[in-house]
UniProtKB/Swiss-Prot annotation:
GO cellular-component term (any): virion component
Ranges of biased composition (kind: Basic and acidic residues): 77-90
Region (Disordered): 77-99, 130-166
An annotated GO BP: viral budding via host ESCRT complex
Pfam families named in the record: Retro_M
Gene3D superfamilies: Immunodeficiency lentiviruses, gag gene matrix protein p17
Residue stretches spanning the membrane: none
Name of the protein this chain belongs to: Gag polyprotein
Record-marked site positions (Cleavage): Y104, H105, A115, T116, G126, S127
MF GO annotations: structural constituent of virion
Swiss-Prot/TrEMBL keywords: Host-virus interaction, Viral budding, Viral budding via the host ESCRT complexes, Viral matrix protein, Viral release from host cell, Virion
InterPro entries in the record: Gag_M (IPR004028), Matrix_HIV/RSV_N (IPR012344), Retrovr_matrix (IPR010999)
Length: 188
């Protein structure tokens, strides 16, 4: 991609291989953010490139002026964003509607006594469906056998490995490496 080519050419001309590593981290992190469907603002925050923001950007962080002023026939009229939003909001409120209110026992919709007439379930008596786990901890220290599954290495966070599901990016590790190795990075 053209950004990577330009950065690598600049690093070669200036002779700064550390800069290549830094920008490689940034590009890799942004690619991972794209794959994880993270917004660019959120990725910038995680990388510490948010321009001094303390909290992650979100809908509540969007800066809006407290009042908007407009001039009507020489008069200044102040209108708060709350008043403006109230004007634009639809008047009808959504009421929750219940769908399929019929009884699953008898099929009647109104006047069913099935739920109130049914007896409570019998108490649990330990039917023996599951084997007892008593003594399992005692067996661990004895014998040279490793427990089943212990021989498989676990995948580290942020690295694709044997872990099931999609691997997530370790943003804290990337931010630490950027802070320690890289040149000062200006907010994008």
């Amino acid at each position: 991609d053209p950004i990577t080519a330009a950065l690598s050419q600049r690093a070669m001309v200036l002779g700064k291989s550390g800069e290549l590593k830094t920008w490689g981290l940034v590009l890799g992190a942004l690619k991972a953010a794209r794959e994880e469907q993270v917004t660019s603002e959120q990725a910038k925050f995680w990388l510490g490139l948010g321009g001094g923001r303390v909290s992650p950007p979100g809908p509540e962080c969007i800066e809006k002026p407290a009042t908007e002023r407009r001039i009507d026939k020489g008069e200044e009229v102040g209108e708060t964003t709350v008043q403006r939003d109230a004007k634009m909001a639809p008047e009808e409120t959504a009421t929750p509607k219940t769908v399929g209110t019929s009884c699953y026992h008898c099929g009647t919709a109104i006047g069913c006594n099935c739920a109130t007439a049914s007896a409570p379930p019998p108490p649990y008596v330990g039917s023996g469906l599951y084997p007892s786990l008593a003594g399992v901890g005692e067996q661990q220290g004895q014998g040279g056998d490793t427990p089943r599954g212990a021989e498989q290495p676990r995948a580290e966070p942020g690295h694709a490995g044997l872990a099931p599901g999609p691997a997530l990016t370790d943003w804290a590790r990337i931010r630490e490496e950027l802070a320690s190795t890289g040149p000062p990075v200006v907010a994008m």
